[in-house]
């Protein structure tokens, strides 16, 4: 089992990214080529849970790595759903704003699941913003022929989450290969994220929009 990294080994900051107060973790040499890591979804998701194992490896390879919390997740802002559209476009704009706010010179993007869809959007809408695009299980739109083949188990598990620890184990199971890290620690971390005001309402709206046709 891979050892748990300590948050003391990372820098932590906030920046205004297209009007969204955005929390992020940073690690790696200041002179290194920048990489922005964009996390996936699911109840209680955030950049730390998604990227804490990858960031030290990338930093040790000489990259300056940034892992941002998407709007409505982690320690980033959770605007009232009545006044904010939790769409993929909002996340695309947040990523572009994050790169601009930190003055990063054409970073590479690594996006997972929901974050993969946002990263693809950045590459399509603002290709001059980034250098390379790497997708890890990136979400996206499905054609009518593809929809019946798509696993409903994952969507049903995410959308039916009831706040219990047992249900969070199901969420982690459906999103991850769980035999190489401490699954209980990940479950507890994601549950602790749900204690922040506005997180659950933001996630419910994100899922409502995603399952209604804007599949990330």
Protein language model features and the residues they cover:
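N-terminal cap/lid segment of alpha/beta-hydrolase-fold proteins
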Residues: 2-22
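Active-site loop/oxyanion-hole signature of alpha/beta-hydrolase fold enzymes
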Residues: 17, 52-55, 60, 67-110
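Conserved HGGG/HGGXW glycine-rich cap/lid loop of the alpha/beta-hydrolase fold
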Residues: 20-78
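Structural signature of beta-strand start/N-cap positions in the alpha/beta core
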Residues: 34, 62-64, 105-108, 129-132
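Catalytic nucleophile serine of serine hydrolases
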Residues: 76, 113, 137
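Gly/Ala-rich beta-loop-alpha elbow adjacent to hydrolase catalytic centers
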Residues: 111, 115, 119
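Flexible "cap/lid" loop of the alpha/beta hydrolase fold
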Residues: 120, 124, 131-168
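Conserved alpha/beta-hydrolase catalytic His-Asp/Glu region
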Residues: 149, 163-216
């Amino acid at each position: 089992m891979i050892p748990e990294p300590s948050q003391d080994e990372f820098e932590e900051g906030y920046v205004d990214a297209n009007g969204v107060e955005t929390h992020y973790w940073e690690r790696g040499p200041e002179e290194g080529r920048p990489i922005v890591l964009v996390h996936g979804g699911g109840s209680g998701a955030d950049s730390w849970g998604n990227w804490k194992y990858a960031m030290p490896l990338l930093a040790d390879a000489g990259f300056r790595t940034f892992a941002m919390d998407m709007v409505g997740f982690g320690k980033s802002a959770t605007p009232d759903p009545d006044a904010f559209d939790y769409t993929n476009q909002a996340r695309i704009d947040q990523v572009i704003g994050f790169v601009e706010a930190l003055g990063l010179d054409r970073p590479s993007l690594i996006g997972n699941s929901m974050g993969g869809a946002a990263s693809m959007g950045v590459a399509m809408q603002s290709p001059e913003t980034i250098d390379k695009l790497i997708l890890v299980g990136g979400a996206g739109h499905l054609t009518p022929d593809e929809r019946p083949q798509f696993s409903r188990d994952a969507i049903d598990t995410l959308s039916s989450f009831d706040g219990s620890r047992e249900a969070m184990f199901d969420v982690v199971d459906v999103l991850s290969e769980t035999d190489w890290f401490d699954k209980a620690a990940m479950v507890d971390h994601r549950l602790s994220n749900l204690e922040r005001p506005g997180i659950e309402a933001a996630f419910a709206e994100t899922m409502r929009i995603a399952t209604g046709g804007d599949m990330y």
